[in-house]
């Protein structure tokens, strides 16, 4: 098997870090769902439901990002596809939020460019 490119290692670590932040957001959302009824948040209609669903969303997203990190780390083709899809969605989102999305366009464009380089695709077998 080919040696993992350094950039792929960096991306896998970044995906793990992002997953950690998603799990932290899930924990905060879960906490807010619990205390919403006993604080001023309870005055907001459906606050508990919103925070509960936010926590579920963040948990699922964090799990998917961890799975993607594993796929990148191990050189799995599906990990490459997930990273390309998430990067493309992020790029589209940044394009839709111009002009503030310029930094995202540059960073995500560079990541997408890197993921499509021959040596990276060969590592993933795609």
Curated annotation (Swiss-Prot):
Q: How does it sit in the membrane?
A: Multi-pass membrane protein
Q: Keywords of this protein's UniProt record, alphabetized?
A: Cell membrane, Membrane, Transmembrane, Transmembrane helix
Would you name any one GO CC term? plasma membrane
Question: Where do transmembrane segments lie in this chain?
Answer: 13-35, 50-72, 77-96, 101-115
Compartment list: Cell membrane
Q: Does the keyword Membrane apply?
A: yes
Tell me where it mainly resides.
membrane
* Protein name (database record): Uncharacterized protein AF_0864
UniProt source species? Archaeoglobus fulgidus (strain ATCC 49558 / DSM 4304 / JCM 9628 / NBRC 100126 / VC-16)
């Amino acid at each position: 098997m080919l040696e993992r490119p350094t950039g792929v290692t960096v991306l896998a670590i970044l995906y793990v870090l992002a997953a950690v932040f998603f799990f932290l957001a899930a924990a905060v959302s879960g906490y807010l769902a619990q205390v919403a009824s006993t604080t001023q948040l309870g005055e907001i209609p459906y606050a508990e439901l919103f925070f509960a669903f936010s926590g579920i969303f963040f948990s699922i997203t964090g799990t998917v990002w961890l799975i993607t990190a594993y796929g990148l780390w191990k050189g799995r083709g599906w990990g490459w596809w997930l990273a390309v899809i998430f990067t493309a969605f992020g790029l589209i989102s940044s394009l839709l939020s111009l002009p503030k999305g310029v930094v995202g366009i540059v960073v995500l464009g560079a990541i997408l460019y890197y993921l499509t380089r021959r040596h990276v695709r060969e590592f993933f077998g795609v």
